[in-house]
Amino acid sequence: MSARNLVTPDDLGRRVSFQFELPNGFQSEVVGVLESYDAAADTYFVRTKEDRLQRVPGRGIRFGKVVS
């Protein structure tokens, strides 16, 4: 399965969903508001409903989309 990320830095402030692979090989998923994007590190930062800031490495993303 090829990666498909439909989220861009222009989506800041919108609700997003990511499925991604962690550096240790495990899979993870996060849903929340896209707070920032670090271009140098190719990393998205998503604020969850638990008010936790989740780092999402761009190169590990399997699927990303904007949700309602």
Role assignments for model-derived ranges:
Residues 1-68:
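Conserved RNA-binding domains used in RNP assembly and mRNA/RNA metabolism
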